[in-house]
Each structure stands twice: as C-alpha cells, then as structure tokens.
C-alpha cells in the first residue's frame, strides 16, 4: 500500500511540475504595453532559426515595435484625437519613434514571447496592420525579418496571401487565436535569419 501511494505521489508531482512548465524552461518574454492600453491584447510566440530553417538560434536580440490600436506610433490614446493628424505627430518623442516597443533575447532553444496589443492600420493609408522586427547578434548582421501581418486585413497584397502556404512555419500572416475565454489572442511567428 505504501509503495502504491509513493508511486501515485511521484506521478502526481511529475504531472504538476509538467503542468507548471518546470520540465521545459520558458522563453524570455517582454510586455510592450501597460494594462490600460486600449486595444486587444496580443501574445506573440515564436522561434528564431538559422538560414537552414531547422536550427534554432540562441542569443538573437529582437527589437519589436508596433502602432497602437488606432494605427499611431507615438501619440498617446485620447478620445479627442483627430484621425486626420499625421501618424508621426509625436509631441514628446523624436519623429518616427514608436511608443509601443521593446526588445528581448532568444533563449537556448531560440524561443521568444512578447505581449502587446493588436495594432491598427495606419490612418489614411493603405498599409496592412503590422508588427516590425529587427534581429541582430549571435554572429548575424542586423536584419529586418518580414513584418507580422494579420489574416483578413484587406490591405495585405493578394500575392502575399497566396504564398503563405509555401512558407510553412515561416508564414508572416497570422490568424490570431483566442486564449481561453478572455479577449486576448495569440499568434505564432517564426523567423528565419539570412546568411551571416
């Protein structure tokens, strides 16, 4: 009887540890927005790969930035904000500086995760809503992987939509999926680095 209880206790502890993620380290993550940022919470997870598309790359520095839910980079949310203002009208920061930004380093398995809001498209322009990435380090020169776009955006060129199937795990158009019963969504986005 004691042996059976010991085995059950060991199995329960192993299952509990696995459920809490202790069997596999968690990727470094960064939160780009405060809890009161207007918009839909978006969690992006992915892995950075070497040019072969198979080997994860540890130690890559990712710099990420995106517009707010209304498509502006720099202006703070305001109900009085006029959407006809130039998108780079940033009174408290240098021009073209994104307010929603951050950086992180990929873990030993090349993984990363960040929390932001789903960006809006630029006002008065025909660009799809997107998130920018810059990758550097780990022996690679600084490079700009494809922007992450969102399925259903009418401004994504038809050719980009058509070629997604060919890209496999390196698709750059994601279809955000709900997380539990809340309003948050998540996307997977993998990056293939260019040659050194």
Give the ranges of each region predicted by the language model.
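Positively charged n-region of N-terminal signal peptides that target proteins for export
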Residues: 1-5
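Bacterial N-terminal signal peptides
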Residues: 6-15
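Beta-strand-dominated extracellular/periplasmic modules and repeats
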Residues: 20-196
């Amino acid at each position: 009887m004691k042996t059976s209880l010991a085995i059950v206790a060991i199995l329960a502890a192993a299952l509990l540890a696995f459920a809490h993620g202790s069997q596999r380290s968690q990727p470094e993550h960064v939160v780009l927005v405060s809890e009161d940022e207007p918009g839909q919470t978006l969690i992006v997870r992915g892995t950075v790969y070497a040019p072969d598309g198979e080997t994860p790359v540890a130690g890559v520095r990712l710099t990420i930035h995106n517009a707010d839910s209304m498509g502006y980079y720099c202006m703070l949310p305001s109900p009085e904000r006029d959407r006809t203002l130039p998108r780079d009208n940033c009174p408290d920061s240098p021009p073209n500086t994104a307010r929603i930004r951050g950086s992180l380093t990929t873990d030993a398995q090349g993984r990363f995760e960040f929390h932001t809001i789903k960006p809006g498209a630029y006002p008065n322009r025909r660009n799809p809503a997107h998130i920018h990435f810059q990758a550097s380090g780990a022996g690679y020169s600084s490079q700009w992987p494809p922007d992450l776009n969102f399925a259903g955006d009418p401004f994504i060129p038809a050719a980009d939509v058509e070629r997604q199937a060919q890209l496999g795990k390196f698709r750059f158009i994601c279809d955000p999926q709900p997380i539990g019963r809340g309003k948050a969504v998540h996307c997977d986005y993998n990056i293939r680095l260019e040659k050194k």
